[in-house]
Amino acid sequence: MVNIYDNANQLAKDLQETEQFKDLKKSLENLKNNPESLDLYQRMDKLQQQILAAQNSGQPLSEEAQKEYQKINEEVRNNDELKDMITKEQALFQMINDVQQAMTKPIGDLYDDLKAK
């Protein structure tokens, strides 16, 4: 019998050996070593948490939060460390998405006979 959890744990270890993971790790180290970029990241993260909380509670985003969001987005577009981190993060998540699609394909295949032809 297959222990799928062992495979998942091995996949997590293998993930850490990919170029995409290593590139993101290096990018995050560069970001941490730049106080200005780190501060911007932390402000962006805090605002994203506030936006998510507002959305989850059905509250509209305040005008002040909208302006802050626009301001931070502009700063991010002009920050090389954050732009690099976002690019590396997107590459890693694209790979993870590809793996997830491969893993879930057999589930979709189970339903193929049920689909209208």
Swiss-Prot record:
A Pfam short name: Com_YlbF
InterPro entries, A to Z: Com_YlbF, YheA/YmcA-like_dom_sf
Alphabetical list of SUPFAM superfamilies matching this protein: YheA/YmcA-like
Record-linked Gene3D superfamilies: YheA/YmcA-like
Family: Belongs to the UPF0342 family.
Protein name per its UniProtKB record: UPF0342 protein LJ_1677
